[in-house]
A protein has these predicted regions:
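Beta-lactam-recognizing serine transpeptidase/beta-lactamase-like catalytic domain environment
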Residues: 1-40, 45-176
Length: 176
């Protein structure tokens, strides 16, 4: 097992070499270096983007039908896998219940300027990127240890609003 005493004062070279080849990566800082999709934690960003651009208000209600059919791959709300939908839901309730369907529709509205234009990935993504940047999610945290750069999604706004698509962040970047 890992013993930091063997690395204090003088370094046991053989031990250090074994740590570097250990498949469990005991020297790898997962909190700052491993990037992953943020998932539902990103829904706060999507809420801010939707509210500030006016595609939703605090009282806007969206009917969760389980399967989102406005785009071709028809993503599903997680609740449907448990035999129900969230029904008519507003942004506060959608955050509380982590309703994917609601945020799919926010992404769609961002990509269509609230249904006034045809669907355009670039339009939706640029708005998501703008608000993620305003919230500091386009930069590292500044802690004084090695940290991977964050990646804001650059495709699929409907999926990006639930923290999927190609969003990628280190845990520390989401925790600030």
């Amino acid at each position: 097992g890992y013993d930091n005493n063997r690395l204090a004062n003088t370094v046991d070279a053989d031990y250090f070499a074994s740590l570097n080849t250990d498949l469990s990566k005991p020297l790898y800082n997962y909190a700052t270096q491993e990037r992953t999709a943020p998932g539902s934690t990103f829904k706060m960003v999507s809420s801010v983007a939707g509210l500030d651009t006016g595609v939703i208000t605090l009282t806007t209600q969206i009917m969760d039908k389980g399967v989102y059919e406005n785009i071709s791959n028809h993503p599903r709300c997680w609740a449907l896998n448990h035999g129900y939908t969230h029904g008519l839901i507003n942004v506060s309730e959608a955050l509380r219940d982590s309703c994917n369907y609601f945020f799919y529709d926010v992404g769609y509205r961002l990509a269509t300027n609230n249904f006034s234009t045809s669907y355009d990935d670039a339009t939706g993504i640029s708005k998501i990127q703008e608000y993620a940047s305003l919230l500091g999610l386009d930069e590292t945290t500044g802690v004084e240890i090695e940290e991977n750069d964050p990646q804001i999604a650059d495709e699929y706004p409907v999926m990006a609003t639930i923290g999927q698509s190609n969003n990628n962040y280190a845990t520390i970047q989401l925790g600030r």
